[in-house]
Amino acid sequence: MNKKGLTVLFIAIMLLSVVPVHFVSAGTPPVSSENSTTSILPNQQVVTKEVSQAALNAIMKGQPNMVLIIKTKEGKLEEAKTELEKLGAEILDENRVLNMLLVKIKPEKVKELNYISSLEKAWLNREVKLSPPIVEKDVKTKEPSLEPKMYNSTWVINALQFIQEFGYDGSGVVVAVLDTGVDPNHPFLSITPDGRRKIIEWKDFTDEGFVDTSFSFSKVVNGTLIINTTFQVASGLTLNESTGLMEYVVKTVYVSNVTIGNITSANGIYHFGLLPERYFDLNFDGDQEDFYPVLLVNSTGNGYDIAYVDTDLDYDFTDEVPLGQYNVTYDVAVFSYYYGPLNYVLAEIDPNGEYAVFGWDGHGHGTHVAGTVAGYDSNNDAWDWLSMYSGEWEVFSRLYGWDYTNVTTDTVQGVAPGAQIMAIRVLRSDGRGSMWDIIEGMTYAATHGADVISMSLGGNAPYLDGTDPESVAVDELTEKYGVVFVIAAGNEGPGINIVGSPGVATKAITVGAAAVPINVGVYVSQALGYPDYYGFYYFPAYTNVRIAFFSSRGPRIDGEIKPNVVAPGYGIYSSLPMWIGGADFMSGTSMATPHVSGVVALLISGAKAEGIYYNPDIIKKVLESGATWLEGDPYTGQKYTELDQGHGLVNVTKSWEILKAINGTTLPIVDHWADKSYSDFAEYLGVDVIRGLYARNSIPDIVEWHIKYVGDTEYRTFEIYATEPWIKPFVSGSVILENNTEFVLRVKYDVEGLEPGLYVGRIIIDDPTTPVIEDEILNTIVIPEKFTPENNYTLTWYDINGPEMVTHHFFTVPEGVDVLYAMTTYWDYGLYRPDGMFVFPYQLDYLPAAVSNPMPGNWELVWTGFNFAPLYESGFLVRIYGVEITPSVWYINRTYLDTNTEFSIEFNITNIYAPINATLIPIGLGTYNASVESVGDGEFFIKGIEVPEGTAELKIRIGNPSVPNSDLDLYLYDSKGNLVALDGNPTAEEEVVVEYPKPGVYSIVVHGYSVRDENGNPTTTTFDLVVQMTLDNGNIKLDKDSIILGSNESVVVTANITIDRDHPTGVYSGIIEIRDNEVYQDTNTSIAKIPITLVIDKADFAVGLTPAEGVLGEARNYTLIVKHALTLEPVPNATVIIGNYTYLTDENGTVTFTYAPTKLGSDEITVIVKKENFNTLEKTFQITVSEPEITEEDINEPKLAMSSPEANATIVSVEMESEGGVKKTVTVEITINGTANETATIVVPVPKKAENIEVSGDHVISYSIEEGEYAKYVIITVKFASPVTVTVTYTIYAGPRVSILTLNFLGYSWYRLYSQKFDELYQKALELGVDNETLALALSYHEKAKEYYEKALELSEGNIIQYLGDIRLLPPLRQAYINEMKAVKILEKAIEELEGEE
């Protein structure tokens, strides 16, 4: 158990797991803008873009720390820990099996992870969340003719028949269920058929059941244990609205004493703590505010082994059940009652008494899954049922004619009733859990004897390729420990490429959900052929197994086949915790997954019994090879593909036959891959190769597949062929492959003549002498429909769908489309972007939808027949809109003394796509500002802007980096640090648009995600920044209020512009908003907002300065960049004035000059830029100035800071003398030379304690004093007539000299001394009951001391002792011990006062 678990913060990210709600609420038009879509994009660095964005969010929110999962390179774990600690990171936990660390780190330090060579990858410790149950629409059911049972779902996969025929029921197999926990005393999860205990292990890797029992007490008076202590208890994770993070709420509870009666602890010491209701109402009293006393005792003298929980909150343990650790004693107790008992266990107890962990299933999901895997009731009637109904499809409709509102607990028989369960809680009672908890649970199960790990959890994100942390863990644990992972595909279907993580793991058996036939209620009308009858009638919707509409479809983003198989997952009846009621129906791939876990248990059970060799690869292969292909709907002719079902419905008897057939043979291993450049998503992949072809947006003509055979013969003959005619291998038929040698198979994809649609096929590589197919390459291509002038840029479909069947429509959205509009005549549909992510979660109903600025590429519209009657019909329409205005730059040139305030400009509106009947809305004028900025690799550029009231649109764009191939990301935050918009594409050309932003201050942030020179070294790039704020202030009027245009038609419009006579010259922004009447009425979305730019009299400059930092007193070259603000082209021959010097820009619009900063922290450089036809610009640049690296020897050593080239200044000599005793006067005399009448600046460092600093000399123009962390700096400006002599005098206390090394050692030692003393006193203060206000004050000084000490650690690279001579350590070490001393003094005083009262 990780005792540090309660310090972890989670990033709250919604992830899929079980079953989604598929419907948008009625009455709300669905509208989406692709500008506001969060992108999680590719990375080839340690820090992913997701982590970078989270770090930036934390910085903007003022969050001090964030928590990451970091994977280290093999054998580099300790080195990585050392390097991370040098950054000031805290190692919260470690997983040595997977070389992973859980790390708390300051967000501003995250970028430095990219430069630690021992690290591989960093991920967020994301929060995983189960989804709510599916709710069907318009489906009614009749009363059941038979009591509900699981047998139909186990029968359809041949599990019951397999057990009856072969006798292997899962005995000897352990299945770990990673979920919300399992009811430890459920009647169907109590024993196996041969009487063995069903649940053999119960572990909790969440924080839910954790109790801090580090408090020990020994004073017992008449059976009463004296506590008299105030406890601070972390009561649970709660969303902090200000930071957006899940954080623990710490509550204070005082306990005076508890009754223990005759309960004894062998060593006389009792450990005590409080169990809070973190996520579950344990006593069902309507709140989660209770704290349950917990008592640990050492019953034998061999360590703490027994726990008591005061479940009735009477502070009396004598009426409670003693619990030993479950996997030792198998003790179970009842916490409380609801519909039935809430059973719980002691999952873990620390032998030293420091903590205890309790377990229960407060959600129900885990118990349902466990029942499906291995539920068993000794009174079950499975065999009677099987003999009565086996082989009759109609029985399923009778069985599934349930009434959801009147379910009674009946027999539950799991797929593998003889298997034993390892209950691993990784999700809390609220259905949430952290990614680290899940990985820890996976590791524990793999290393503690699990044969199968069943994971009905997961979530989706763009571009999942199996490189996320959970998937990496799945693959590594499979390789290292031979455990079989069975994982849910997810419930975000039926769009393609939507399988979630960790289901995308290569080694996982990923499971989709099938639906067995059920009875449904359908309103019968004349249209269905019943002229005399109306109303709901019940009959089977279909008679063969289908794929559940919600099941996530493949392929994986790199083309790999996912899911691998399907199993029943719709309306599954299984066990639920007894407190809920014992059993019920649930749907989802979460329910399908345990069916396959049970099948794997059956196969392994038989293999163990018969001595058949197996491993995870073999089990996966025989499952796939034995699966039953599901054809689809015979009435509509709709068919399923590998994307829907993988290899088909699991069939345990067929897989068993194959497993036996290959026993004793050596199967050849065949692998394949192709370069990722063939993929549409190459730039987003975290891997270098693809495992299949997923041609979503473009189809390669030829792909070169690399094939490699490894086996027990030098050569082997394989048959290579394609399952579809459009896949044409250049080599087909028999091919002889050489062992351990790559063979390149060229394949042509002949798509000419294919109708629009989705095409899926495989390339088979098969040794016909074996009972399995050795290898296969999945190929998925999309042939989209096109918007054309002939179809008025409108596509329509009228479809007939069978129940649980899916219709896919793909269409291409070209570049430059303003709005994508979609609608249906009746049934719901899904809309998916070209990257595979849904636009609206999850289904759209009859309300029209609009997507502004849609992502270019091939979109998918998909709809399903749900569980409705055969041949349901619906029509769909999609349309694109796009308009352009020419010219889009308008010029107004006023003449001298012109009094005119009205100006007219003609422009053309051209309708590019679908016909429009539109209203024109002019908006303007507004501001237009352009500048040239800079950002370094991994750094952030931040600029504040103020958005005024009445702003109709805020548009920000960046681009044109000086370093080619830079990847810059653009973010916009509000004044509270909330992310408003982002563009995170893998380029430097980014744009965000916010319509009608709230007035206030915003921050523009540009992240230099990857800025590398041609050699791959980190560097700095400049970029253009344009900020436009368009205000609706009535400056623009049009001569037309509305227009009607067909495709490619134009109209001339006159804009009448009103400006004041004294309106400043420059560049301004405006918008012509075009509202198609139908689209706007349906969705409240304009079909276009065309930006226009108005230039009044003169243009503006856009200027930038690079670099943006410097060191005090150190001269360096700076470059001023001058561009045209509108075109962003360089402006040559512009006059630039900096100080007293004048320059001309070169052909690149740049001026390079030398400058040395003379102010610490921030210095200013003011420039004036002039040119004809441009407004004169005066701008002051702020540069960040750091203190120079300085030692004691550098004190009083002057440096030449700044001079003009003409001055040619040099320091001729320096003399220093001092006099006096304790208070010493120091004189520094400097002689410098330079060109007459020119100026120069010098910097003289003096000791930090110097006082009464004076500067004298005939030619001193001015001087100033800057105080740094290590010294003071005298900045002196002189003007030359001849060699100039400058004198600096100051006084300083010169008492007994103590070296820097000694002072640092004293600070270090005193801090550690006081820190140790603080820990002792704080514990004593808690025991004595010191008030919370005093404790909090002491803690604040203690934490401040810790921060200063960590700063010293950071400066010394984690080794203070070796750096004691470093002057930089002096301030933080001094502050560390001073603050720790204050904390100690506060506690000493409080304790003294309380003890004095006694």
Curated annotation (Swiss-Prot):
Residue ranges listed under propeptide: 27-149
Look up the EC number in the record and give it: 3.4.21.-
Q: Which Pfam families match?
A: Peptidase_S8 (PF00082), PPC (PF04151)
Instruction: Detail the disulphide connectivity of this chain as listed in its UniProt entry.
Output: none
Main localisation: other
The domain of life for this entry's organism is: Archaea
User: What would be the name of the gene that encodes this protein?
Assistant: pls
TM ranges are none
Q: What organism is listed for this UniProt entry?
A: Pyrococcus furiosus (strain ATCC 43587 / DSM 3638 / JCM 8422 / Vc1)
Q: Which UniProt keywords apply?
A: Glycoprotein, Hydrolase, Protease, Serine protease, Signal, Zymogen
Annotated signal peptide = 1-26
* Family, similarity comment: Belongs to the peptidase S8 family.
Function, please? Answer: Has endopeptidase activity toward caseins, casein fragments including alpha-S1-casein and synthetic peptides.
- Cite a single GO MF annotation: serine-type endopeptidase activity
Record GO biological process: proteolysis
Protein name, per record: Pyrolysin
What does the PTM comment state? LWM pyrolysin seems to be produced by autoproteolytic activation of HMW pyrolysin. Glycosylated.
Q: Where is the active site?
A: 179, 365, 590
Tell me which SUPFAM superfamilies the record gives: HCP-like, Subtilisin-like
Q: Which residues are glycosylated?
A: 152, 222, 228, 240, 257, 262, 298, 327, 406, 651, 663, 739, 792, 893, 908, 917, 929, 1048, 1056, 1084, 1117, 1133, 1140, 1148, 1208, 1233, 1237, 1332
